[in-house]
């Protein structure tokens, strides 16, 4: 089974791929970083440089804010955002 990974934070349990074949966002919120595909990146396809910049800026802010889970009451037991970021090749010390 293919995992649907958030390109912003590496969360690997998105319900659908973040973007469709044409590059449009799926309008899902990432449960981890709260990025809203198709809204926070509206007007850009997945391959657009602006989309990658938006992802990077959102990620940097999320990390700076302490990598909070979208809803603290629903945060998975043993969730580790530092390990999660490795899903997208981001290595940070923790």
Give, region by region, the residue ranges found by the protein language model.
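Short linker/helix segments within small regulatory modules
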Residues: 18-28
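Short, intrinsically disordered terminal segments enriched in charged and Pro/Gly residues
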Residues: 45-94
